[in-house]
Structures are given as structure tokens and as C-alpha cells.
Amino acid sequence: MELDINRTLLVLLGQVYTYIFQVELLRRCDPRVACRFLYRLAANCLTVRYLLKLFLRGFNTQLKFGNTPTVCALHWALCYVKGEGERLFELLQHFKTRFVYGETKDSNCIKDYFVSAFNLKTCQYHHELSLTTYGGYVSSEIQFLHDIENFLKQLNYCYIITSSREALNTLETVTRFMTDTIGSGLIPPVELFDPAHPCAICFEELCITANQGETLHRRLLGCICDHVTKQVRVNVDVDDIIRCLPYIPDVPDIKRQSAVEALRTLQTKTVVNPMGAKNDTFDQTYEIASTMLDSYNVFKPAPRCMYAISELKFWLTSNSTEGPQRTLDVFVDNLDVLNEHEKHAELTAVTVELALFGKTPIHFDRAFSEELGSLDAIDSILVGNRSSSPDSQIEALIKACYAHHLSSPLMRHISNPSHDNEAALRQLLERVGCEDDLTKEASDSATASECDLNDDSSITFAVHGWENLLSKAKIDAAERKRVYLEHLSKRSLTSLGRCIREQRQELEKTLRVNVYGEALLQTFVSMQNGFGARNVFLAKVSQAGCIIDNRIQEAAFDAHRFIRNTLVRHTVDAAMLPALTHKFFELVNGPLFNHDEHRFAQPPNTALFFTVENVGLFPHLKEELAKFMGGVVGSNWLLSPFRGFYCFSGVEGVTFAQRLAWKYIRELVFATTLFTSVFHCGEVRLCRVDRLGKDPRGCTSQPKGIGSSHGPLDGIYLTYEETCPLVAIIQSGETGIDQNTVVIYDSDVFSLLYTLMQRLAPDSTDPAFS
């Protein structure tokens, strides 16, 4: 049943996203054309209203607790498209009144419509978040999706010092931001995400991968996040128009056929070279050399210069075919070719529009063509175009980097070994221009080419002695200089390649089309469910058959003194400290990182590690937290006065509130442990309020005492609420809280333990706790 519901919700979510995409297309169309679809838009707006009314009660119920990413995404998408669809409908009606019905024919009216449709004068992504914790008021400004993710991680760290009412009010503001972003469809605006900020998933991935001697935080500096938003490869086919044109509906066949013929005529006249410009000079030289060589055969004697030309052609041919393709040869496109593609695509679109409609509509990109044309190269690349995929732009950028680096003569020689052979062939052909001096010129050219091709040939010096020594020294110095420059150039090429490989990941993330990932949605749902679980828990326990409220019991003070004075004379066994430390880590952690609840559960300290590391907690605070349970001497773990457990009155500052909360939770852990060992009433289970009915380690058997003999939900629950921090459940049924269940409210640890002792003792007859 649950699987069918999820499938239905996913299908509905897909349909809503399709409608959002259609609204976005309609908003970018010429408003004179979009006004024709007002009736269809109105029908869709009414359908969205019906869906919201149909699901509103279910949304409100599930948003309190047990929310899922699918339900959350569907709710946000419906709320967004309801507002945007109706706003677009009103704008089109207003435009139709002004422009179509003759009030004004100003062309600026179309641009004003686009400014209003896209809210170009205001930024809707800047929000101020405020949160009131037990340690005071904090605020944060959000601009990017990663700001929301960081705030949710900070809220997770402050889970134990924040009331559910304040947290849920803050999450309402976050919900409005998420509705305008994730609810707006699949593709986020470029200005909304910053991939240089790693998320929690990036941090976890780096923790389990090889570090190669680098620290984790140093690796985070070069991390490109692909979880909050995910990049996708987009293939742009320039032949989409001609392939889909014959199947366009609502167009007369004559106009459709004339558009197809006009488009084919345009394609035959316009040829765009996708491979870029080649070296035309060398192609002509190579063609002349081939023509001269083809004029000779085995029956016709050839001069020596022809053999030199043949050898140069041999080396050039062998050099161009052997070996793998170089990196430079892969990046053949350039920015000029991409611009030509864009112009050709625009010309194609205009041709089809004139053939079909007799005029060209003013869409969004044409209305702001002047603004788009004034952009510099970097902004133009970020904006992109319709005819080229982002990967083509990336390849063009990388090719431009290589071309700029290889523009020096030395780098051209290193990257292109056949450059010298090309120059020699060109010079040789120039020297063979005169037929009368062919033999002499061919001999000189062959001699020069043989010297160039055979670098290892021995050089005979006519002068011996000191002149020979000086000449050899000069040659050796020149050779060392050449080798050094070649080595230096190869190192620079290697460094350039490594730099481009490192920067390519960031280029791809920035320029490619991105879609919203599931990381931010899952984080929000986890935090909302974590705080909503408190309200749901208090609502469930209020339905118990027997409720004892020690917060108003007159005899609770005597019970407090009895249990406190009894436990203070005992100490915790040192062998139990590791287990108690893990319990402490489990209770001070937030709901976001729950590695101790996984199928292959990890210790609670692992989950707490991710909590504190993702908020950048100071090292001295992490050390203090790690040694918090081991720093107990005697009875210094006792902290709270009577009915003063989890009281933060007069505390200022988040850090001070956190320390006080740690002390309260440590007191609770030690008190329940000593109570179990002293009074032998069975093990008292300490549970988190957001894990009601969950066994974090997946055990089927419950411990003896609370949790086994009386019911699966029995235990002491820490609610993290100042008004009612402690709730104990006794005798819960198999189905949960029923009329036989006993629930105890308290704000004091020791009076609560006394009540449990009275209830769990087999001969309990004290009427004060009946």
C-alpha cells in the first residue's frame, strides 16, 4: 500500500513539474502569442487549486511528523506553481488589455512585461533567518542553497538547546525559501548555488576515501559539491528544427511545407565548419609538394631536391599518423565557431518563423538582445546559448588556454615536432622556383634538409687546436641550453595540463546545466521531523490511561532528597564508562546524522563526529566534549536543584547553553545508571524523544526491567523542552500508548526515579504514587 502511494505521488509530482516547465516556457514567450493560451492557463490554475485543496489536510498532518521528501517536494511545487501560474495569468490579462486592445502599441510594453514576469528589479533569494535558543537569539542571512544547508547543520548541532516551537517557526521561513527554489522546478538559477561550498555528503565522502597524506580540511578547500545541485550533460542537436518541423500541429500544410523548403535552402547555402579553421598556408604547401612529386615516376629521373621533398613529406606524414591523439587536438572548437553556430541557429529560427507566421515574435532573449550583446566574454559564457551545449563551451575554453600557452615559438616547437619539417618543406619549395637553377637549388636544399633531419651526424671541423675546442664548447653550451629549454617547456606543458584537469571540474559544474539534488531536501525533512517528533510524542503520551505529573506533586521534594542522598554515596564502575559515554554521545547529538540507526550501525560517537565537524566546532570544545564523561570526580556530576533539571534561566550564549545541556544530560546518565545498580529495579532505558519505539541497534530482545517486562516503549525519554524535559513511560502495550499505560511528567531526575522505583517494586503500596 505504501509503495503504491509513493508511486502515485511521484507520478503526480512529475506532472506538476511538467506544468511548471510549461509555465516557464510561456513566461519567456512573446506575450502577444502567450495571450492565446489564457484559457488553458486558467484551467490549469483551477486544477492546481483543486489539488491543493484535496491534499491540504494530508499535507498539514504529515508535515507535523513523518514527512517524506516526496510529499515535501510535491507540497512546495504545488504552492509555487499556484502562485506563479496565477500571477502569470494576471500579467497576461493586463498586457492584453494594454497592448492587444489598443490602449498602447509601444514596443517597450513587451520589455516591461518581461521585467514584471521575472521580477528583474528585485531579488527574492535573500532572507534573514532568526532563531531563539536557550542561550539567546541568533540570526543568519541566506543567499545560496548552501547557506540553507549550513544553517540546518547548525540547527542540528543546537538541537538540544532549542525548543520545538522556536525551531518550527524558523523552519517556516526556510520553507518559504525552499518553495521559491526547489518548488520552482528542476533547474536552479546559476546565481543560487556556489559549488565551492562543500556539503555534509562531501565531507562524509572525503572521510572514507584515500587522503594521500593531505588533511581533511585541506581537501575540502578544493572540493566541488555535486549533491545540493547535480550537473547533467545536455546534448544540443542543431537539426531539431528540421526534424520536428513537419509534425508541428495547428499549422496549414502549405505553410509547413514552405518552411521546410526554406530551411533546406538555407542549409545548402550556409555551411558552418564545426571543426574550426585549419592551417590553410600549410595545406597549400603540402598540395604543391604532392603535385610536384606526382609529376615524377620510375621512368623519369628526378633531381636530388625531389628526394629531399619526398623525405620531408614522409616525416610529416608519419608524425601526423603515429601515436595517440594529443590533448590539443581534442579541443578543436573555439569561441568564434560557437558564435557562428549561434548566429546560424538564430537565422534558422527566423527563417522558419517568417515562413510559418509571416513575422518574428519578440521572445525574452530578443527583447533583451541589446543587454545580452553588451555582455563581456565571461558573462556570455555563463549565460550560454541555444545552439551549443555547455560542454562545447568548456572544450572551447580549454582549447583557448592551450592555444594561448602554445603561442610562443619555443612552445610551438615542443608541442609540434613537425613544425621544423613544415618550415623546411616550405623553404625548399621556394628555392625550387626557377627551373634553370633546379639542380643547384635542389642540391643545396637536400643538403640543408639532410642536416635538419639528422641531428646526430658528426661535424667535421677544419680548424684544430684551440679553435676546435672553443667551437665545441659553444656547441655543447647551445645543446645544453636547448635541452634545458625543452625540459622546461615540457614541465610547463605538464603543469598546464594538470591545472586544466583540476579546473575542468569547476568549469563543468559552473557551466553545465544543474538540477536540484536530494541532499538539501533530505536534510530539511530530517530536521523538521526531528523537532516535530517532540510535539507528536507529547500528544501521544497525553492519551495514556494514567498520568502522573510530579511537577505539581507536594511530596516530590522528599522523594528528590531521598534518591539524591542515596546515590551520592555511590560511584559508577569505571568499566561502565565507555558504554555510558556512548549513551551520552547519543543523547547530545541531533537528528540529522543518525549513523547509529543504520542497518550496519556505527557507534554514536561517529554520528556526533559528523555533527560537530560539519559546523566547524573549535578543537578545544571537541576535546572538552570527548572527555566530558571521563572528567567526573566523586559526586561532581550532580548539578540540578529540585525541579531545576534542564533549566537555562539566565544563560547567555550558545556555547554556555551547550555546556549546561551537556552537564544536565551527564547527570541524567549517571543518575539512571546508579539507580539501576543500587535499587535493582531493572535497567532503566534512556531514549531520545525523536526515536520513540525505535531500537537503535536493531535488537529484538529488550533489556530486563523497563522496556521488556512492561512494554516495548517503556523508558525515560528526554524531550529537550524546558517546560517538560523528562517523561517516563511504564506498562505500554504492544500497540503503543493505551489505557493501561502509566506516564510520568517531571522536571527533576531524582523525583522521577523515585516514582519509577515505587511503580517497579513488586510490593509497592505507596498511595502517593498510585
Swiss-Prot record:
Pfam families: PRTP
Source organism superkingdom: Viruses
GO terms under cellular component: host cell nucleus
Positions annotated to bind ATP: 675-682
Primary location class: host cell
One BP annotation, GO: viral DNA genome packaging
GO function terms (MF aspect): ATP binding; zinc ion binding
Function description: Component of the molecular motor that translocates viral genomic DNA in empty capsid during DNA packaging. Forms a tripartite terminase complex together with TRM2 and TRM3 in the host cytoplasm. Once the complex reaches the host nucleus, it interacts with the capsid portal vertex. This portal forms a ring in which genomic DNA is translocated into the capsid. TRM1 carries an endonuclease activity that plays an important role for the cleavage of concatemeric viral DNA into unit length genomes.
Family: Belongs to the herpesviridae TRM1 protein family.
Subunit details: Associates with TRM2 and TRM3 to form the tripartite terminase complex. Interacts with portal protein.
Protein name: Tripartite terminase subunit 1
Organism: Varicella-zoster virus (strain Dumas)
Gene assigned in the entry: TRM1
